[in-house]
Design a protein with these regions (language model features):
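"Short basic amphipathic alpha-helical interaction patches in structured regions
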Residues: 28-35, 110
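A short alpha->loop->secondary-structure connector
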Residues: 34-45
Length: 199
């Protein structure tokens, strides 16, 4: 797992572990293996305000809405940063226990590569991505705290480039606070989405 962490930190930013036969273990055993492997990379952190550490992504029959996380619906998810409305984890893992009969595709994109593409082709819009956007928190906060948070897509701390991007949360955030996303911000989000979706 040391090599995996090195690849995450200094390599392409993702890796696939595919030598473990899911048919040889129960669901609980697979979760335990996932927990152990994850712990060898970093300390696991909650995926929700309620403290959920391992989070099932499945269709619960709910419809997308301002208080419903999209990963609990059958809605297709765009490329996004998990938990972008609060504090996204440094690493993110996904374990496939059972593939869907239909749909359920997963993909990976690099927000660093997207940043560099935006810098080359859309520098003015990239500047807007360094300024805050409203993000819907989908009820993932303590009572009485704001329902939306405000964060830029990109920030640089002098050492590392940090990124959080979720178009759905941005659009819903502006709707929640009763404000209109500025035209430059809308174009920046749409262009970023196009860059991430390009083959």
């Amino acid at each position: 797992m040391k090599a995996v962490k090195g690849r995450l930190e200094r390599g392409v930013g993702f890796t696939v572990l595919d030598r473990l036969s899911v048919r040889s273990f129960t669901k609980d055993e697979l979760k335990s293996v996932y927990w152990i492997l994850s712990s060898l990379i970093a300390r696991p952190v909650a995926q929700s305000f309620s403290g959920t550490l391992l989070y099932d992504v499945l269709d619960t029959g709910k419809l997308k809405g301002p208080k419903v996380r999209a990963d609990l619906t059958s809605a297709e998810l765009d490329f996004h940063t998990d938990y972008s409305y609060n504090e996204p984890p440094r690493y993110f893992g996904l374990q496939t226990l059972r593939t869907a009969k239909k749909g359920g595709r997963s993909g990976v994109v690099s927000l660093l590569t997207a940043h560099n593409e935006m810098r080359r082709h859309h520098p003015r819009l990239l500047e807007r991505l360094y300024r805050p956007f409203w993000l819907n928190r989908y009820g993932e906060h303590a009572p009485g705290l704001p329902k939306a948070s405000s964060h830029p897509v990109y920030s640089f701390d002098g050492n590392e480039l940090w990124a959080r991007f979720n178009p759905r949360n941005i659009y819903a955030g502006y709707e929640l606070v009763g404000k209109t996303l500025d035209e430059e911000g809308r174009k920046a989000v749409e262009t970023m989405h196009s860059v991430l979706s390009a083959p």
